[in-house]
């Protein structure tokens, strides 16, 4: 496959309403390589559409897909819906969820410092 014909990858976002999560939404909204297909959030945001959540960034809200925020409790059963996960979760929440997703074969990109010790280890 040439770089001009890359297939679009389905991605999930962990975090819905925080600044980092909204920055991810902004970056993913028009990205040519990614399609945002699922967003997972806190119990406070579960069941709400992304467009219902207060927008905190100074830039205007991007055109977002019509997605309803899902519960983190359902994420492992949803892993067939996406292959890449971007995480804006706080470290204490991210630790277990991200580890489980990686074990299920998802590529996980995290903003949390939770797995820093793993990144510092030799993997050769």
Segments from the language model and where they lie:
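N-terminal Rossmann-like NAD(P) cofactor-binding subdomain of oxidoreductases
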Residues: 2-124
